[in-house]
């Protein structure tokens, strides 16, 4: 027997990927609904070998489903997630709206799976920011072994993190440069083709962007509030796949060989780390894949106990849709989905 599942925001990059992954992992589904805004009513999306038409979020009866995956804006989620949760189903929300709410668990299943047990406070579970998701999967097993003191991260984030408009802008500018000149930027503040932009989101008063703040706030909530973490987030002209250069300082001794072994034996991680010119992972190779990949693991000789590493993942998958589906699988394994429906 399967569940009744709705995907809200089904026409976007992440919403479509949610549908793809639900089918790929054979999540037990009796009935699937694609939900979108009024302007997308009737738009067709695929679910395995089936084509389903989008239904209107304003008219849909959410008491008829057990689980809702949300891929919408934070503003939309702030309005709709509480309404949907009150109707009975558990909402797994991919926006930033609920991540720091003390009554909403922020979950990466490889990192803090037990937090799903208190999802019934609001019937909402938050998905972390895409760049945070891959980072914490790599940090958690090392923290468990040697207690992380400080982390310095530089991200190299693909344009798909800004949605279809971001991908279209990179494509149009790249083509345009070789024909009539690049069209002016619309989605990004400056030209993204053949360029990098050290700015994602909006500036805060301290000079950091909200994208950078999300990473340390979310890491603190999921792993340990005592970890000192500083971040620079950069948009790069890559379609799909986020990369991160990560420097870690530990309280306790941990060398590169032991770290490599720990990471190899940790869930959700694949270590690709050979010291030749192709012995590392790139975002292109990670596209379409489930794991978080770790490469370039090496000691940092500038501190007593330190490491450097390179972390890569498909941001539309582990950074968003896959993590949401993995949370759904965790709820299923623990028998929490049916409990939510009965409580509603």
Predicted regions mapped to residue ranges:
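N-terminal Rossmann-like NAD(P) cofactor-binding subdomain of oxidoreductases
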Residues: 1-192, 228, 261, 275, ...
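Generic solvent-exposed, charged/amphipathic alpha-helical segments
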Residues: 19, 216-220, 260, 264
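Glycine-rich beta-alpha junction loops
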Residues: 38-40, 130-131, 155-162, 196-203, ...
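Helix-loop-beta segment of a Rossmann-like dinucleotide-binding subdomain
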Residues: 119-126, 195-206, 309-311
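A glycine-rich, Thr/Ser-enriched phosphate-binding loop motif common to dinucleotide/cofactor-binding enzymes
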Residues: 123-134, 207-216, 221, 319-323
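Oxyanion-binding "anion nests"
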Residues: 192-239
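C-terminal active-site/capping subdomain that shapes the small-molecule cofactor and substrate pocket
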Residues: 227-344
